[in-house]
Amino acid sequence: MSDRSDPTHAIWQKVLAALTADDRITPQLHGFISLVEPKGVMTGTLYLEVPNDLTRGMLEQRIRVPLLNAIGSLDEAAGVSNFAIVVNPEIAQDAFAQHPEPAAEQPYIETPTITAPTDNPGLPASPSRGDSRLNPKYGFDTFVIGGSNRFAHAAAVAVAEAPAKAYNPLFIYGDSGLGKTHLLHAIGHYAISLYPGIRVRYVSSEEFTNDFINSIANNRSSLFQSRYRDNDILLIDDIQFLQGKDSTQEAFFHTFNTLHDHNKQVVITSDLPPKHLTGFEDRMRSRFEWGLITDVQAPDLETRIAILRKKAQSEKLQVPDDILEYMATKVTSNIRELEGTLIRVTAFASLNKTPVDLALVQTVLKDLITLDEDNVIAPVDIINHTAAYFKLTVDDLYGSSRSQAVATARQIAMYLCRELTNLSLPKIGQLFGNRDHTTVMYANKKITELMKERRSIYNQVTELTSRIKQNHRYGKM
């Protein structure tokens, strides 16, 4: 924090006053400006520190002209004609080591206060790394950065480093399978590593809806409210699923307002930008636009190759670079299918005790190449085909039977729903008798592992995939 007795502080306050009066500076840009720390003047240059590259980029691009105009409005005695930006990540951490300044001294946005969990037997335990529902596999260290997601990644890092300081809410949108959920979990993990005791909760919109319905049915509204409002960071996935659910939207509206009013960070993902979420009231859509909106797009070839290479390294798979490149040219739709293809290829090689070469990859890929984007497989078709293949009924797959035959068939159906559709884990769980999303995660992981170990499982999954896609192409069961 700058010293108010330093002449630089007085200069910066005059610059801030000019920027406040500038119509070009939107509330979103004010958020970026609030992260700036003036550090001194040397040979006519005002040196400014910011916590991350994203903020530096915004100052040097979108805010550059208004900032130069503000500097130009200073009297000659200030001795300032230009500015320079220095990135100092310690600024973000310092923000939490001090008390928020009075409103008069902090003109744009108040620094959030991270509080330790309190012992209150009437409330649910505050989220920590253990109960924040974060997936340990999804961190920034496992996220592959490319041109399609670079800005979204930078924004996510900035939010984790300085929650509620500038981009609140952070709204990330894009098609399924492009890394939005990964970024949500990574924000949570990174924030917890920076600020021990910070309260983080991840939730899908389906889980939020179910919790809300259960709280009404069980007359436990206060517990529902504390579960989602007593957080420093709330990460909510696939907000589009709240469209048309008026009561749940109302609950989220009040949750959002409570968190935002108390300078707590909200991060939201969606498959559409706010203006296209027509199933929400205008007041909710406008709140989505209060902070920073960014998108993730389908990865380019170089990024797809890098994703495959990182996945191969994490799974300790030996795959030549030319094979990774070939797979990356053939699978272009999303990251989930790209990684699933790699698992299929290496599982086939392991079962047949053969090296991963071009001929093998071509054999495996012939039944895996994605259908046209408009030719979407319905989950009910997957379930029907799986039931017929294993000579079971659909009710068997939906039901509670734990016999090995039924359980394996159910897990394969869940795996295929995850691989061949864009449904989220909670949505797949709902299809199978309202099972929890963790059950779907377990099924996906188990079938992935069994495919490497048992030829029978690999053959069953491969044959079912082929049948489902052929049926979809030619319309016959």
Swiss-Prot record:
It is found in: Cytoplasm. Residues 133-349 are annotated as: Domain III, AAA+ region. Residues 1-87 are annotated as: Domain I, interacts with DnaA modulators. GO terms for molecular function: ATP binding; ATP hydrolysis activity; DNA replication origin binding; lipid binding. PROSITE patterns: DNAA. Keywords: ATP-binding, Cytoplasm, DNA replication, DNA-binding, Lipid-binding, Nucleotide-binding. Disulfide bonds: none annotated. One of its GO terms (biological process) is regulation of DNA replication. Its main location: cytoplasm. Transmembrane segments: none annotated. Pfam families: Bac_DnaA, Bac_DnaA_C. InterPro entries: AAA+_ATPase, Chromosome_initiator_DnaA, Chromosome_initiator_DnaA-like, Chromosome_initiator_DnaA_CS, DnaA_C, DnaA_dom, P-loop_NTPase, Trp_repressor/repl_initiator. Residues 112-131 are annotated as: Disordered. One of its GO terms (cellular component) is cytoplasm. ATP binds at residues 177, 179-181. Residues 350-477 are annotated as: Domain IV, binds dsDNA. Coiled coil: none annotated. Domain I is involved in oligomerization and binding regulators, domain II is flexibile and of varying length in different bacteria, domain III forms the AAA+ region, while domain IV binds dsDNA. Oligomerizes as a right-handed, spiral filament on DNA at oriC. NCBIfam families: DnaA, PRK14086.1. Belongs to the DnaA family. Plays an essential role in the initiation and regulation of chromosomal replication. ATP-DnaA binds to the origin of replication (oriC) to initiate formation of the DNA replication initiation complex once per cell cycle. Binds the DnaA box (a 9 base pair repeat at the origin) and separates the double-stranded (ds)DNA. Forms a right-handed helical filament on oriC DNA; dsDNA binds to the exterior of the filament while single-stranded (ss)DNA is stabiized in the filament's interior. This is Chromosomal replication initiator protein DnaA. It comes from Clavibacter michiganensis subsp. michiganensis (strain NCPPB 382). The lineage of its organism: Bacteria, Bacillati, Actinomycetota, Actinomycetes, Micrococcales. The gene is dnaA.
